């Protein structure tokens, strides 16, 4: 498939986790155009993909916050800023554009930017492969969280007991889908609010919950389950199988970044060996084994301001204090 040339942007952030979102905020706050490429179907990185319901206690000034709530706050902070969030795009190639900038290739597009900030964490979090007999016979089998808005009036079978499955089931129901949620073990995991909404829907016969239940095979019409030893056919227009994610760094490790194992060496500004390419968060060698949100946020602010100055040399390196500037954007 021929890649489509996306509109140019000044700064491209690879990774929509907390570090990437904060870097996007700071660069856009300085008045630059920013695009974020996120491999999954939603931003949030590890916080949403792996532990959305865990409580975080070491965000400065915030005694405690759920991971999903922190992601929501980071997105809200983007406000009216010029940030283009692109989900479902895995960065695969990096090449110079001949003018001092860079071109990043994904499966379907080419993105040109004056500077790049790598915030890819453990790598692209890709959904585990669906390995169910008959998976190739059903017309719509998915392994990642979809946008619920497009499923009104559809019958959706959600398979999985992870928090993402319970959240997806509730969001799909609220979007107007007819939902069946199933898991091979008894019970489901999720934050108390989501589980309460799940139970309310079950009691009101708005959603069918089947657990424990074994998914035997998929069919063109839906799925065949075994519930309490008895076969059960479930009709479904869409089958959503959520079995977690696997990190994949392999595309980025082909880039000439002088890799040190799973880390990218960086200087005090976050810049790598490539001019205009910066690294922050879990990928940055300077952070060592301190995989902390507080450190990632600091790296994001430093790299974003250096990248802003790199793209627009007339901008001061230091942005000043937000309390003195106020509003959007800071130039």
UniProtKB/Swiss-Prot annotation:
Gene3D superfamilies linked to this entry: FAD/NAD(P)-binding domain (3.50.50.60)
UniProt enzyme class: oxidoreductase
Catalytic activity, as annotated: 2 reduced [2Fe-2S]-[ferredoxin] + NADP(+) + H(+) = 2 oxidized [2Fe-2S]-[ferredoxin] + NADPH
Recorded GO MF terms: ferredoxin-NADP+ reductase activity; flavin adenine dinucleotide binding; NADP binding
Binding site for FAD: 38, 46, 51, 91, 125, 282, 323
E.C. no: 1.18.1.2
Highest taxon in the source lineage: Bacteria
Disulphide bond pairs: none
Cofactor binding remark: Binds 1 FAD per subunit.
HAMAP family per UniProt: FENR2 (MF_01685)
Family membership noted in the UniProt record: Belongs to the ferredoxin--NADP reductase type 2 family.
Quaternary structure note: Homodimer.
Protein name according to UniProt: Ferredoxin--NADP reductase
Native source species: Deinococcus geothermalis (strain DSM 11300 / CIP 105573 / AG-3a)
Lineage of the organism: Bacteria, Thermotogati, Deinococcota, Deinococci, Deinococcales
């Amino acid at each position: 498939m021929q890649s489509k040339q996306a509109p140019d942007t000044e700064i491209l952030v690879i990774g929509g986790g907390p570090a990437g979102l904060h870097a996007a905020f700071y660069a856009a706050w300085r008045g630059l155009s920013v695009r974020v490429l996120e491999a999954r179907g939603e931003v949030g990185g590890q916080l949403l993909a792996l532990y959305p319901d865990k409580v975080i206690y070491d965000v400065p000034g915030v005694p405690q916050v759920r991971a999903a709530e922190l992601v929501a706050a980071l997105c809200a902070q983007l406000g009216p800023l010029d940030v283009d969030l692109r989900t479902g795009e895995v960065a695969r190639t990096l090449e110079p554009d001949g003018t001092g900038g860079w071109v990043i290739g994904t499966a379907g597009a080419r993105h040109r930017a004056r500077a790049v900030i790598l915030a890819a964490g453990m790598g692209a979090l890709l959904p585990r492969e669906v390995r169910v007999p008959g998976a190739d016979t059903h017309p719509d089998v998915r392994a990642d969280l979809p946008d619920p808005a497009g499923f009104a009036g559809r019958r959706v079978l959600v398979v999985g007991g992870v928090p993402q499955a319970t959240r997806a089931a509730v969001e799909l129901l609220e979007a107007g889908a007819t939902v069946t949620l199933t898991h091979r073990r008894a019970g489901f995991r999720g934050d108390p609010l989501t589980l309460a909404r799940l139970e309310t829907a079950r009691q009101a016969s708005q959603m069918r919950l089947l657990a424990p239940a074994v998914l035997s095979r998929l069919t063109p019409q839906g799925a065949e389950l075994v519930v309490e030893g008895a076969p059960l056919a479930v009709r479904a227009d869409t089958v959503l199988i959520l079995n977690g994610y696997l990190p994949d760094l392999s595309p980025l490790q082909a880039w000439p970044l002088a890799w040190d194992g799973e880390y990218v060496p960086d200087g005090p500004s976050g810049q790598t060996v490539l001019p205009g390419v910066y690294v922050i968060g879990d990928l940055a060698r300077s952070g060592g084994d301190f995989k902390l949100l507080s450190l990632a946020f600091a790296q994001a602010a430093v790299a974003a301001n250096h990248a802003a100055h790199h793209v627009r040399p007339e901008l001061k390196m230091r942005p000043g204090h937000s309390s003195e500037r106020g509003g959007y954007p800071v130039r």
